[in-house]
Design a protein with these regions (language model features):
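PLP-dependent enzyme catalytic core of the Aspartate aminotransferase-like
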Residues: 112-113, 174-210
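Conserved PLP-binding catalytic core of the aspartate aminotransferase-like
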Residues: 127-181, 185, 189
Length: 210
């Protein structure tokens, strides 16, 4: 449930193609070596800075030197205007924090939280895509529950649980989706260790009636 970048690199080489990785969701895990790094194999790597990196809303583009002129031309002036120096300072501060032992412990706890809840779902007849998780995300296939991802998203929002609908193999419509995506960095920031609060509420049936 991690990426085989070496295999992707071989496929790209066989087709004379660039290999690009968008690690927006997993960049915090990559930064702390809790997930494989794409940098050895990819020509271009992009990421947001506000997800698992826990910084301000921004983005980063890494690329091989021979692609500099093409990347620069694509970004400015077509996509980017003047820089926001306050955001740049915020990103720099967060990147420094991501090198700390405290941030590494935070990422490890995020993964532990996700695995704890994955175990709970598996024990209660929920079908997880890939059977579990090795990062901070859970993909729950809801086909055997008779509820769409969009409806579950709406219900969870009413009880202050943030998820989003997603598509899963076999879906006929991407508008509603039979899959729900859940991520756990925000829960940990709110001091939800091992998802204990969420699991206890789920066991009692609180907020689960739709």
């Amino acid at each position: 449930r991690d990426f085989d970048y070496e295999r992707f690199r071989k496929i790209a080489n066989d087709n004379n193609s660039y290999l690009m990785c968008d690690m927006a969701h997993i960049s915090g895990l990559v930064a702390t070596e809790e997930f494989k790094s794409p940098f050895e194999y990819c020509d271009i790597v992009t990421t947001t800075t506000h997800k698992t990196l826990r910084g301000p809303r921004s983005g980063l583009i890494f690329y091989k030197k021979e692609l500099k002129s093409k990347i620069d031309f694509a970004v400015f002036p077509g996509l980017q205007g003047g820089p926001h120096n306050n955001v740049i300072a915020g990103v720099a501060t967060q990147l420094l924090e991501s090198m700390s032992y405290e941030f590494r412990d935070y990422i490890k706890q995020v993964k532990k939280n996700a695995r704890t809840l994955a175990d709970y779902f598996n024990e209660n007849n929920y079908e997880l895509v890939t059977g579990g998780t090795d990062n901070h995300l859970l993909l729950i296939n809801l086909k055997n529950k008779g509820i769409s991802g969009s409806k579950l998203e709406y219900v969870c929002e009413k009880v202050d649980i943030s998820i989003n609908k997603n598509s899963v193999f076999g879906d006929k419509s991407g508008q509603f989706g039979d899959c729900a995506t859940e991520g756990y960095p925000g829960n940990l920031i709110s001091s939800l260790d091992d998802n204990g609060v969420t699991i206890n509420k789920a066991k009692r049936g609180e907020g689960t009636h739709w």
